[in-house]
Regions:
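N-terminal beta1-alpha1 cap of cysteine-dependent amidohydrolase-like domains
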Residues: 1-99, 108-115, 119-143, 149, ...
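Active-site loop->helix "elbow" adjoining a glycine-rich segment at hydrolase catalytic centers
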Residues: 101-103
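Catalytic beta-strand/loop module used to bind and position nucleotide/cofactor moieties
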Residues: 211
């Protein structure tokens, strides 16, 4: 099985990670908690992938902005591993999965910026409530639990949006709406809709990197599982695609000839 590194968090004088994250990572391999005290090169050499989980706000100084008054205190543990560990996985071209803060941090690593304060989005919200619609390029929609104090503003270099959620009323009060992404999709009834959106998921165009703004670990989101498997098992995905293309298509004429 694959060994998948995931940032450990520090709280109440202890180091650990939530059961939801550990169980979710366990769907894809064996989780390994990593800390700033670990040797980053040993982690890269011994692990097949890295998960950057959710957490506190990303330090705005990393993307050249002055902290907003409502911007929270950065997680020093996570910021250190963002600087020391994550770039080594990028350099090694090993898979990286970002969730919530992890997505924001990856965006910043590739030169992107963030909206620092999203009104109405707090970590005190119900993390299991799938109350927003995720629009994807395939046209298939998913219900997701999007709760995030910050969000992608400008996408980083070579990052491509693969999911978007509609900006809820009141969220854009602190920044220029022209900076938001305009998206056209289909609603739950199949009707075309156009709206301002948050980037809710992205992938890297050439590297095995995928990230989600929402929290797929709370409900084992099928879209996230599908996209994560694409970066963790690209050979299997390519073989499946090839198999689907090589399956003969039976037509009505074929069935008539066989009778």
């Amino acid at each position: 099985m694959k060994r998948i590194a995931i940032y450990a968090d520090s709280f109440n004088g202890k180091v650990g990670q939530s059961l939801a994250y550990m169980n979710f990572v366990g769907l894809f391999g064996i989780p390994r908690l990593v800390t700033p005290q670990d040797d980053p090169q040993e982690i890269v050499d011994s692990c097949d992938a890295l998960v950057i989980p959710g957490g506190a706000d990303v330090n705005p100084l990393r993307y050249g902005q002055v902290p907003h008054p409502a911007t929270g205190r950065a997680n020093v543990y996570y910021e250190f591993m963002d600087a020391i560990l994550a770039p080594k996985f990028v350099e090694a071209k090993k898979p990286i999965i970002g969730i919530c803060r992890g997505m924001q941090s990856l965006n910043v690593m590739f030169g992107g910026t963030l909206y620092q304060h999203i009104k109405g989005h707090t970590q005190g919200s119900d993390r299991t409530a799938t109350n927003q619609t995720l629009f994807t390029p395939s046209g298939k929609n998913y219900k997701v639990n999007t709760i995030h104090h910050q969000a992608v503003q400008k996408l980083g270099t070579d990052l491509e949006m693969i999911g978007a959620t509609q900006v809820i009323e009141g969220c854009n009060s602190l920044y220029n709406q022209s900076g938001l992404v305009s998206v056209t999709g289909k609603d739950d009834k199949g009707k075309d809709v156009e709206f301002y959106a948050f980037v809710e998921a992205f992938k890297h165009k050439t590297l095995p990197i995928v990230a989600f703004q929402y929290h797929p670990e709370e409900f084992n989101c099928p879209f996230a599982i599908q996209e994560i498997n694409k970066v963790l098992n690209p050979v299997i995905q390519e073989e499946n695609e090839q198999d689907r293309q090589e399956v003969p298509q039976v037509t009505e004429e074929d069935t008539k000839e066989g009778n």
